[in-house]
A protein has these predicted regions:
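S1/OB-fold single-stranded RNA-binding interface
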Residues: 47-53, 57-139, 143-151
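OB-fold/S1-family RNA-binding modules
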Residues: 1-68, 131-259
Length: 259
């Protein structure tokens, strides 16, 4: 029997419903194994903890690592050049970058800083945009899942910096080049999303749902459909769930000015 911390956070107004959704998914996966995956609860930073038991526990653990990612057990696991999955925290509260919680277990909370100058260079060709403009453009709000690559770690681990990983950067570039609006949903289960899309009559206007995390997703709008219109339809059905509009046109206008 082992207790694991998944790189998934539980948050929002309907935590019980979210826990049930995740447990249903995990039980469905483990039904064909000699293993049981039980959702225990969450850590102080809202990371989900599960208990894995049974003779197939190694298989189940590997699945959890591939599907969700497992939080580092200590600061010593963090190395320069290593890639990590995390969630944005305290978005917009500082002007010099974004902090990412990577789930590391430590006596004192340690988040990784992606500096403003790095975000400008990677996302906007060094255009001198404020952190708030960058956050709004790419919907980089609290709990947005972000994959980063460590670039600097202080000897005492008190300060850590990173840049966007190549995979994360490629994903963002693809979002822009595709040219389609997206609705970024932060804090809703797959069942909630499916219900809201059907109930609002938005099935024809949303061509695909891309999972960013178990409780986060990107709704890709069809050509000619704008994200704010979809948000107005979904808002009442996803009460309390943050919804953000991603507009490639807006980002391209920033890049055009930069050139």
């Amino acid at each position: 029997m082992v207790t694991l911390t998944l790189l998934e956070k539980i948050y929002g107004l309907e935590e019980d419903r979210s826990f049930r959704s995740l447990q249903k998914h995990l039980s469905s996966f483990s039904s064909g194994l000699e293993a049981k995956i039980k959702v225990l609860g969450k850590t102080e930073q809202n990371w989900i903890q599960v208990e894995v038991s049974g003779s197939d526990s190694v298989v189940a653990t590997n699945y959890l690592n591939q599907k969700f990612g497992l939080a580092p057990s200590s600061l010593e696991e963090l190395k320069v050049q290593s890639e990590l999955q995390g969630k944005i925290v305290d978005s917009g509260k500082i002007g010099y970058g974004l902090y990412v919680d990577v789930g590391v277990s430590a006596s004192k909370k340690r988040d990784v800083l992606v500096p403003l100058y790095v975000l400008r260079k990677q996302l906007f060709e060094d255009e001198k945009l404020s952190i708030r403009r960058i956050i709004e453009a790419f919907c980089l709000h609290d709990n947005f899942p972000l994959r980063i690559k460590m670039t600097r770690i202080a000897i005492d681990k008190s300060e850590m910096e990173a840049e966007l990983s190549e995979a994360q950067l490629t994903a963002f570039k693809n979002w822009v080049s595709l040219g389609l609006d997206r609705v970024i949903v932060l804090g809703a289960s797959p069942e909630q999303i499916e219900y809201a899309i059907k109930k609002s009559g938005s099935m024809r206007d949303i061509i695909r749902v891309d999972r960013l995390g178990f409780f986060e997703c990107s709704l890709i709008c069809k050509l000619g459909t704008e994200a704010p219109g979809i948000i107005s339809r979904l808002g009442n059905l996803l009460e309390g769930v943050p919804l953000y509009a991603f507009s490639p046109k807006k980002i391209k206008s920033f890049l055009k000015k930069a050139s």
